Amino acid sequence: MALKKMEEMSASALRIIISPVCYNEKGKIEKVIVRLKEFLKSKPGFSVMIVDDCSTDGSGDVINESGLPYILHENQQGVGVAIRTAIEYACNNNFDVIVIMAGNNKDLPIEIPRLIGRIEEGNDFVIGSRFLPGGSYDNTPFYRVIATRYIHPWVVWLTTSKRFTDTATGFHAIRTSVLQNPEINLEEEWLEDYDYEMYLLYKVITLGYKIAEVPASKIYPPRGISYTKMKPITGWWKMLRAFFFLRLGLKK
């Protein structure tokens, strides 16, 4: 794993780091970088660390040329491991909060203060929900709306008795102190893909941490343009299996 030099943007009451995760997002990561740089002009107290999961399409070159700090995986390991890398960096470098966001231009950096505002109010984990009033899900395919608005929250309710409007957004803020709880094992070998975030959510719920949702945007590209690497059915199962495995005691 190659670590490029990190320079903090400035000091703030909470040390906050934004971590987009990326794999083969050429044509999209450029837009993420532009939006991040615009955001940082008005919010210089935030830091950034991009995690590139060994992209092979030139995304790494774009990130390198951007001047933003980044970590490069030497081999592709999966989105879950990329998130773990971001979390480990945040914890090891004494950040108070990490914001995880997509590297495919579906999330808007300008909405990050909504997440942080609820953290500052005392919450430990804040989810950006596309389905709350004020949120949006432009161009989202119908079947994905059904899955993310109804099926995913139902599974969460079934296994934890907690209700949320959006549990598959991938855009959230979490206190690093939560991530250092010994009951949360970030090194579980079975967590390599999208189930990593579901594992975190399950643990945060069942350990009694304070969770909030805020309106957020999840913007999909126009029809005909590739919008996800997740495969229907198998990808959804990878996301949801963490709740069943943990609830049934099959995994820790």
Model-derived features: where do they sit?
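Hydrophobic helical membrane-anchoring modules
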Residues: 1-14, 161, 185-252
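N-proximal low-complexity "stem/linker" segments adjacent to membrane-targeting elements
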Residues: 1-35
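Short, acidic, metal-binding catalytic loop of nucleotide-sugar glycosyltransferases
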Residues: 34-45
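Conserved donor nucleotide-binding strand/loop of the catalytic core
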Residues: 49, 60-93
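A conserved acidic beta->alpha catalytic loop
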Residues: 52-60, 105
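Acceptor/aglycone-binding surface of glycosyltransferases and processive sugar-polymer synthases
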Residues: 75-77, 81-89, 109-194, 221-230, ...
